[in-house]
């Protein structure tokens, strides 16, 4: 009986094998997500300037070309996006546009295009961050962008069709990034990228939509 049960589980897992595009696969979180999902699914690794598949998420035409190349997928994961850090008194519209153009609109570009290239029941997982709820000095751009992304996901979830889901992962500062960003995050508990990657697994391999998965 146990043997038959195990065979059933193996068969079920094989049937759940998905084709997943990971945008930002060469970054710290992206690599951890690929490592977390690759044992169970077929992963398409997408970088910004390296690898077989590349995309400039700030350019909607580049995003469209990417999906023309990779075809239909079951899920997309975005761990990409740049932000600007600096004192409020020195912020200019040009500096503020860094986060708006890249992390915010770049990921929204991905979602808007991906909805038409996902198989029925597919999923979209984006990335925001703890600063949406816990602002820090010199982090106005990051707080604005992350909060907007959380809002976009909650709103988009009620309009997506064909059973497509959308969620977002909101991580704290990474342990791997403390050397560069640690002084901005005194008092924050850092998390390893491997732990953050579990939240992406929950989104991709789960059933919920409109969720903000906080890793903090």
Model-derived segments and spans:
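Catalytic loop of short-chain dehydrogenase/reductase
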Residues: 99, 106-109, 123-149, 153-158, ...
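C-terminal helical subdomain
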Residues: 161-164, 168-216
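Conserved Rossmann-fold cofactor-binding substructure of NAD(P)-dependent oxidoreductases
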Residues: 57-73
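Conserved NAD(P)H cofactor-binding loop of Rossmann-fold oxidoreductase domains
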Residues: 77-86
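Substrate-binding pocket helix/loop in short-chain dehydrogenase/reductase
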Residues: 87-88, 95-97
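N-terminal Rossmann NAD(P)H-binding glycine-rich loop of SDR-like oxidoreductase domains
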Residues: 22-36
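Conserved mid-core alpha-helix of short-chain dehydrogenase/reductase
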Residues: 62, 105-113
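Rossmann-fold cofactor-recognition segment
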Residues: 47-61
């Amino acid at each position: 009986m146990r043997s038959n049960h195990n065979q059933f589980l193996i068969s079920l897992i094989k049937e759940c094998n998905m084709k997943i595009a990971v945008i930002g696969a060469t970054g710290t979180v992206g690599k951890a997500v690929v490592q977390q999902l690759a044992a169970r699914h077929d992963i398409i690794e997408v970088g910004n300037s390296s690898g077989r598949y590349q995309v400039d998420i700030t350019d909607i035409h580049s995003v469209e070309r990417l999906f023309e190349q990779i075809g239909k997928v079951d899920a997309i994961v975005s761990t990409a996006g740049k932000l600007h850090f600096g004192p409020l008194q020195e912020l200019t519209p040009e500096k503020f546009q860094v986060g708006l153009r890249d992390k915010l609109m770049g990921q929204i570009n991905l979602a808007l295009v991906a909805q038409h290239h996902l198989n029925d029941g597919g999923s979209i997982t984006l990335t925001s961050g703890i600063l949406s709820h816990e602002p820090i000095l010199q982090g106005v751009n990051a707080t604005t962008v992350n909060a907007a992304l959380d809002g976009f996901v909650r709103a988009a979830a009620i309009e997506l069709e064909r059973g497509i889901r959308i969620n977002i992962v909101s991580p704290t500062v990474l342990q791997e990034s403390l050397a560069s960003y640690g002084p901005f995050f005194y008092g924050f508990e850092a998390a390893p990228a491997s732990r953050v990657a579990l939240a992406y697994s929950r989104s991709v391999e789960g059933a919920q939509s409109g969720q903000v998965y906080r890793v903090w």
